[in-house]
From Swiss-Prot:
This is Acireductone dioxygenase. It catalyses: 1,2-dihydroxy-5-(methylsulfanyl)pent-1-en-3-one + O2 = 3-(methylsulfanyl)propanoate + CO + formate + 2 H(+); 1,2-dihydroxy-5-(methylsulfanyl)pent-1-en-3-one + O2 = 4-methylsulfanyl-2-oxobutanoate + formate + 2 H(+). Binds 1 Fe(2+) cation per monomer. It comes from Granulibacter bethesdensis (strain ATCC BAA-1260 / CGDNIH1). Ni(2+) binds at H97, H99, E103, H141. Its cofactor is Fe(2+); Ni(2+). Monomer. One of its GO terms (biological process) is L-methionine salvage from methylthioadenosine. Fe(2+) binds at H97, H99, E103, H141. Belongs to the acireductone dioxygenase (ARD) family. It is an enzyme of class 1 (oxidoreductase). It comes from the Bacteria. InterPro entries: ARD, ARD_bac, RmlC-like_jellyroll, RmlC_Cupin_sf.
Amino acid sequence: MSRLTIYADSTPDAPLLRTEDPERIAQELSSIGVRFERWSSAVTPSPDDDEATILAAYRPYLNALMGETGAGTADVIRLRPDTPNLPALRQKFLSEHTHTEDEVRFFVHGSGNFILHVDDRVYDAHCTQGDLISVPTGIKHWFDAGETPFVTALRVFTDTTGWVAHYTGDPIADHFPAA
């Protein structure tokens, strides 16, 4: 189930809000410019389906989303316990960073946490199958799918070079493990 936990950035042990209500999650994230939606699809591909099958299953949604955002490409990312170089890959995502384009993800299977650092607040958005999240350009954040991840997600990019992080050097992510 999707969940949002909000903290003051100085108190990782004291949540200010914790909700599993999708409407409240969308409302709270919208207040900081983050888009959150639940998508329902008549077709849910298997976790083992190839990238082309997964992209085809969500093509109507992707076409609409890419038209709205001006995105030029989409792909599928999978994180599993047997993903090559998983510890190094995970560390790339765990460090606070920004992007020069919106980071748009749709969770096909599994779950992961987008943790956003905005002003003096930390927003931990636990996303699950059927969740769409779009983190605007420049918002400081990190991502955690856990030490034994199981996630398949669609990624939408404006820049065809794909995922490029600009690390902030702030160690805040070390103090806010995924809720």
